[in-house]
């Protein structure tokens, strides 16, 4: 991925089981996987640089602006409260931090699935999640479909990836109007007055 070299910092947060299974070759010092229920697959990933924590995904146990990158790989599709997960991700993400969100594409053949295994599945269009991100002051850097099994990525690809960066300042500024003092000789009232 061309965005990986741009990611700097010390900690990456992977929220959800699918996020934890994504391998990233980042130079981060520490990767933290947050999950509501620990599974043997995720336990096998733990080492000196990877921690596994069982928590509620809607109340992250971190202080504000501590994490530099957040991965949400299909986490929002299985969440009961995706807005709260995004708000918590925004809270713990450092200024100019990155967020990677993968979603099941509602235009793919998965549209007819309502469950995956024991988990209820909800489809969110990418434009809706991008709107949620803009309300949290994220700048969407890229949105791209991801194909599977050597297929060409199209609008009907099963997964859509959204890459966004947290911005410190609002994206739309409303500057106050600055009125400069107009020189006397340019004022319409004084244009035809003679100097004495």
Predicted regions and their residues:
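Short alpha-helix
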Residues: 119-143
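Conserved class I S-adenosyl-L-methionine
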Residues: 98-123
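A short glycine-rich, Lys/Arg-flanked "PGG" loop and its adjoining helix->strand segment in the class I
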Residues: 83-98
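C-terminal lobe and adjacent flexible extensions of AdoMet/dcAdoMet transferase-like proteins
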Residues: 158-196
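Class I SAM-dependent methyltransferase Rossmann-like catalytic core
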Residues: 1-6
């Amino acid at each position: 991925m061309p965005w990986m070299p741009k990611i700097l910092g010390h900690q990456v947060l992977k929220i959800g089981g699918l996020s934890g299974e994504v391998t990233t070759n980042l130079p981060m010092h520490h990767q933290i996987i947050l999950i509501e229920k620990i599974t043997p697959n995720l336990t096998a990933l733990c080492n000196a640089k990877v921690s596994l924590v069982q928590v509620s995904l809607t109340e992250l146990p971190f202080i504000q602006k501590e994490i530099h990158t957040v991965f949400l790989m299909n986490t929002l599709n299985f969440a009961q409260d995706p807005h709260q997960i995004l708000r918590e991700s925004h809270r713990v993400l450092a200024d100019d931090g990155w967020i990677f969100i993968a979603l099941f594409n509602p235009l793919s053949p998965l549209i007819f699935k309502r469950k995956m295994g024991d988990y209820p599945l909800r489809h969110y269009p990418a434009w809706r999640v991008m709107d949620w991100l803009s309300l949290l002051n994220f700048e969407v850097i890229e949105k791209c479909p991801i194909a599977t099994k050597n297929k060409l990525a199209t609008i009907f690809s099963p997964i859509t990836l959204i890459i966004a960066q947290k911005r410190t300042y609002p994206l739309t500024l409303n500057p106050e109007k600055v009125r400069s003092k107009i020189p006397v000789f340019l004022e319409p009232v004084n244009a035809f007055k003679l100097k004495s």
